[in-house]
UniProtKB/Swiss-Prot annotation:
Keywords: Allergen, Disulfide bond, Glycoprotein, Glycosidase, Hydrolase, Signal, Zymogen. GO terms for biological process: carbohydrate metabolic process; defense response; hyaluronan catabolic process. It comes from Polistes annularis (Paper wasp). One of its GO terms (molecular function) is hyalurononglucosaminidase activity. It catalyses: Random hydrolysis of (1->4)-linkages between N-acetyl-beta-D-glucosamine and D-glucuronate residues in hyaluronate. Disulfide bonds join C48-C337, C214-C226. Its EC number is 3.2.1.35. Pfam families: Glyco_hydro_56. The active site is at E138. This is Hyaluronidase. Belongs to the glycosyl hydrolase 56 family. It is an enzyme of class 3 (hydrolase).
Length: 367
């Protein structure tokens, strides 16, 4: 491991805070089965092989990873927009193209599931795959109200379909009907996708990336607590969480945020995922998706303080582990590969090994 001197920046956490982490995390996790706190590597560092560089050292820091730096492998695999979920696909001219009906209420489930099965066979041919399976689908949200920004087109399209069918209805009646239809079939597509994944790769542990959503640290909701409506809506998604072995809240932070806002963001999202897990009979694990760069400044790695604080919030609020994610654009040149490897060896790795050993009771925290 990297040698840490007493005056190192990693000593900023005292024994008192170490005790606080252990006592608080035990309290938060007490309602659920005690699990080994694990950190996973979900970065396409196989791309660095072309520069004669590998990342075998992740193992030295108690970080679980796929063999040969594979992005999808025996330990963890993420599937981006798999199958043929109904969606309105943006075109370069600003228009949209319907994929499989455009919105879930017009989609063909058979076409989607056949394609999903083919994608799974292509990307993970091993039927005995026993790792973590992450379905990353972000074209729309299964809660109608939550489709804003890039996904709002699906809400508008759904409303227009009902308006054409019932031109004399009031706007409130139209929106209510659009909501009902959209959410019914959104559930159908997402639920059947999970069921098929679990049926064909029985040994794997499955879940959807990003859920539960929280919508905290926003202009309208600046604090750590999740949006009140979102919390109620998360309870309505029990059909999804009941089919997941793992919850994957996303805790990517931004450079423009104040230091305390980054803490709030992680705190609220982990608490919400743990709350949901506690309310489910099978108590799914909570693994936070964590990115080592700032979401709005992707050329800047998280400071040591931000690594420390975000890891600390994941642990103390009851998370069961961390998935370190990275984009292909993070490792698409020799200089970027060198930078990431140096960051792993000098910053990220030491934090990872100290957190895992502390939470799992093998040492006292020594940042």
């Amino acid at each position: 491991y990297v040698s840490l001197s007493p005056d190192s920046v990693f000593n900023i956490i005292t024994d008192d805070i170490s005790h606080q982490i252990l006592s608080r995390s035990n309290c938060e996790r007490s309602k659920r089965p005690k699990r080994v706190f694990s950190i996973y590597w979900n970065v396409p560092t196989f791309m660095c092989h072309q520069y004669g560089m590998n990342f075998d050292e992740v193992t030295d820091f108690n970080i679980k990873h796929n063999s040969k730096d594979n992005f999808r492998g025996e330990t963890i695999s993420i599937y981006y927009d798999p199958g043929k979920f109904p969606a309105l696909m943006p075109l370069k001219n600003g228009n949209y193209e319907e994929r499989n009906g455009g919105v879930p209420q017009r989609g063909n489930i058979t076409i989607h599931l056949q394609q999903f099965n083919e994608d799974l066979d292509k990307m993970t041919p091993d039927k005995n795959f026993g790792g973590i399976g992450v379905i990353d689908f972000e074209r729309w949200k299964p809660i109608f109200r939550q489709n804003w920004g890039n996904t709002e087109i699906h809400k508008k399209y759904s409303i227009e379909l009902v308006r054409k069918e019932h031109p004399k209805w009031s706007e409130s009646m139209i929106e209510a009907e659009a909501t009902k239809k959209f959410e019914k079939y959104a559930r159908y597509f997402m639920e059947e996708t999970l069921k098929l994944a679990k049926k064909t790769r029985k040994r794997a542990k499955w879940g959807y990336y990003g859920f539960p959503y929280c919508y905290n640290v926003t202009p309208n909701n600046p604090g750590p607590d999740c949006d009140a409506k979102a919390t109620i809506e998360n309870d309505r998604l029990s059909w999804m969480y009941n089919n997941q072995e793992i919850l994957f809240p996303s805790v990517y932070v931004r450079h423009e945020q104040k230091p305390e806002e980054r803490v709030y963001l992680v705190q609220g999202r982990i608490k919400e995922a743990v709350r949901i897990s506690n309310n489910l009979e099978h108590s799914p694990s909570v693994l936070a998706y964590w990115w080592y760069v700032y979401q709005d400044k992707m050329d800047i790695y998280l400071s040591e303080t931000d690594v420390e604080k975000t890891f600390q919030e994941i642990v103390t609020n009851g998370g069961d582990g961390i998935i370190i994610w990275g984009s292909s654009s993070d490792v698409n040149s020799l200089s970027k590969c060198k930078r990431l490897r140096e960051y792993l060896l000098n910053t990220l790795g030491p934090f990872a090994v100290n957190v895992t050993e502390t939470v799992n009771g093998r040492s006292s925290l020594n940042f």
